[in-house]
């Protein structure tokens, strides 16, 4: 008999849905289909796309496209620009879930390396929505100094090292308004896996040592870590097999099953999983999920994960062939069954922008 459990509305605040000029990697229908197959109600899309979401016109283009194609609820980030787009904030802030600032190398050309420009964006973002940052190593300390000065609610994405966990633990003890996210690939894999996976285990931040991985699990236990986020970032097999493979791996359909596997192994409680993928992101973004929203999971379902059967367009995963325990059987949004355990039932356009201007 299945061991079924009902989970509340899940939120992934860190995804790259691709679409638009990158629709060959994934489009807003295929990747939100991956979201509902992974149990999610809501996903928040990053701005490093083509065109990059750095101005009101590009933002409206993306809003229109996601609105027409999404099968789950959604939001999009506006991107901070190295060329200084702070003058646009008044025009876009009401339509987005937050501001994204890239402070280390990543996919796309959105890196802000100039400390003065980073500070200008911190000073200008006064809209009560989180400022989310890609910061690694010593850059984490630099961003914390801006948090300390401007007191902006700041979310640190995909933290991957023991050093960073230490900095952020101290910052939390200081009372700074920060939250911390980690990704499943950093929790389950190390640099040894990248050597075997090659480019299919290549992402930013990259995989780290076993000691770093263990520090992330320690951060979950100590509550330095608030959120587990997928950093879903699909690319085609051909791109990953090229001479210059891009960063990123898909993750929307493996995040919850991996966490449920940790529950089965006694590494996490189910309540802690719910905090990491539902309660904490809802609290940070001030979200009240609609009635009739959540997913049903079979906690005892044991199976070999087959990436060829996934909803994401790229049809591969660094976790392909891994034995998992815990499977999404149904996902509901606003009382509607959007995923039945095998097929996506919602039609493109069903998903709503939770941050739509009212």
Regions from the PLM with identified roles:
Residues 4-69:
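Metal-associated gating/positioning segment near the N- to mid-region
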Residues 87-228:
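Histidine/acidic residue-rich metal-binding segments in metalloenzymes
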């Amino acid at each position: 008999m299945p061991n079924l459990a009902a989970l509340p509305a899940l939120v992934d605040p860190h995804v790259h849905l691709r679409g638009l000029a990158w629709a060959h990697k994934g489009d807003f229908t295929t990747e939100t289909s991956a979201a509902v197959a992974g149990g999610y109600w809501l996903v928040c899309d990053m701005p490093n796309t083509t065109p990059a979401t750095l101005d009101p016109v590009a933002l409206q283009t993306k809003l229109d496209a996601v609105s027409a194609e999404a099968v789950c609820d959604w939001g999009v980030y506006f991107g901070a620009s190295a060329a200084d787009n702070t003058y646009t904030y008044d025009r876009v802030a009401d339509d987005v879930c937050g501001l994204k600032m890239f402070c280390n190398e990543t996919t796309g050309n959105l890196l802000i390396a100039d400390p003065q420009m980073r500070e200008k964006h911190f000073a200008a973002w006064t809209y009560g929505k989180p400022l989310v940052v890609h910061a690694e190593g010593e850059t984490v300390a630099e961003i914390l100094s801006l948090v300390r000065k401007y007191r902006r609610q700041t979310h640190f994405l995909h933290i991957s090292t023991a050093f960073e966990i230490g900095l952020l633990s101290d910052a939390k003890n200081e009372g700074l308004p920060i939250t911390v996210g980690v990704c499943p690939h950093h929790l389950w894999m190390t640099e040894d896996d990248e050597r075997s996976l090659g480019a299919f285990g290549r992402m930013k931040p990259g995989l780290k040592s076993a000691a770093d991985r263990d520090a992330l699990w320690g951060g979950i236990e100590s509550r330095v870590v608030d959120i587990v986020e997928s950093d879903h970032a699909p690319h085609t097999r051909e791109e990953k097999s090229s001479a210059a493979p891009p960063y990123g791996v898909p993750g929307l359909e493996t995040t919850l099953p991996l966490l449920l596997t940790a529950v089965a192994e006694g590494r996490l409680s189910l309540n802690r999983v719910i905090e990491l993928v539902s309660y904490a992101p809802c609290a940070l973004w001030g979200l009240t999920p609609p009635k009739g929203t959540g997913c049903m999971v079979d906690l005892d379902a044991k199976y070999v994960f087959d990436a060829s059967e996934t909803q994401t367009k790229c049809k591969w995963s660094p976790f392909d062939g891994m034995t998992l325990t815990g499977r999404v059987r149904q996902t509901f949004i606003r009382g509607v069954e959007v995923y039945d355990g095998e097929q996506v039932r919602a039609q493109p356009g069903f998903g709503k922008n939770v941050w739509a201007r009212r």
